[in-house]
Every structure is written in C-alpha cells, then in structure tokens.
C-alpha cells in the first residue's frame, strides 16, 4: 500500500540522517542535494601531471562510500601517477567542490566534484597536482603568504557533424588572444 511504502521511505531517510551524523556538513549537503535534485550521475574529476582532466562517473548510491573510502582506479593509465607495478590508486571526492553541472538539461542532472588522488594506504599521491598545490600553499602560509587558487576550465565549441572522420570545424573564429 501507499502508506507502507511511505513508511519505508521515511525509515530509509531517517536511517540516512542518523548515518550523516558522522559526516561533515559539506558531505551532508552534497548527499542531500543529489537526492533532492534527482541527480543521476556524479563525475569525480582529477587531473594528471600535464593538467588533463580525468573523470570517473558514479551513481548516487555510490557517493556515501566514495566519501568514506574513495574509489579505486588503475593509476598506471594516468600520465605521471604510478608505474604499472604500483597501479592501484584511489580518488576521494572533496565535498567542498560539489557543483551541479549547468549544461545538463532535463529533470535529472549531473554533478561534479574535484578529487584527491591517494595511494592504497590512504597517503596523498606524490603525482597528484592537487596535492602538490596543497603542499606549496602550506609552505607559502608558513612564510606569511596567502594565495587564492581556482581551476581554469577551458573548452572549444565545434559545429555538429555526423561524419567523425572529418576535421572538426570551430563555431567561431575567435582566438585565445
């Protein structure tokens, strides 16, 4: 019946709220927003040492575990992270970077978070540009400096084409400079 279904949904929500007691407010906000906005995928973003954006998509049901444990991936496939002999790596989402992606239309959206790259024992990867930046900011702070840093995400727009063997045609002739 409808009332028993509603009771089960409320029990599930209460159980989740009890578990959220151990989470920080940013994790709680991300989980609540994913549920309220009917987000279907969360993209976990990180970069290689060359600054190339990498993305792993997870379902909302996987987000809580990703906050707690991270998500494993093959680090040897990412430029500059590891050698093949030490390929297991973990991405752990930073809930302070949670954002609904605005270009995904329709009732169900997609969100993204930037991630830290960790070794299997939970230590920051020395090949993670985000970790290198955090170290540099920490050293600068020790010397009395404060920096404000944000990612610069760039893209190009091309005309739609059905034949992918052709060279892409830019939408405009504007240049970078």
Segments (PLM) and residue ranges:
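Glycine-rich, acidic/polar active-site loops that bind/position phosphate-bearing ligands
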Residues: 20-177
């Amino acid at each position: 019946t409808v009332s028993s279904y509603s009771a089960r949904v409320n029990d599930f929500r209460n159980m989740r709220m009890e578990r959220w007691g151990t989470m920080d407010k940013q994790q709680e906000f991300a989980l609540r927003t994913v549920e309220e906005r009917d987000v279907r995928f969360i993209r976990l973003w990180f970069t290689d040492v060359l600054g190339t954006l990498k993305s792993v998509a997870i379902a909302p049901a996987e987000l809580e575990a990703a906050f707690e444990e991270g998500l494993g991936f093959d680090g040897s496939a990412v430029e500059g992270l590891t050698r093949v002999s030490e390929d297991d790596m973990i991405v752990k989402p930073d809930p302070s970077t949670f954002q609904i992606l605005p270009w995904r239309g329709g009732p169900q959206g997609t969100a993204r978070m930037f991630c830290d790259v960790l070794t299997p024992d939970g230590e920051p990867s020395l090949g993670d540009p985000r970790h290198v930046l955090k170290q540099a900011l920490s050293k600068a702070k020790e010397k009395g400096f404060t920096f404000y840093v944000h990612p610069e995400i760039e893209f190009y727009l091309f005309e739609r084409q059905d034949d992918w063997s052709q060279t892409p045609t830019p939408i405009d002739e504007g240049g970078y400079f």
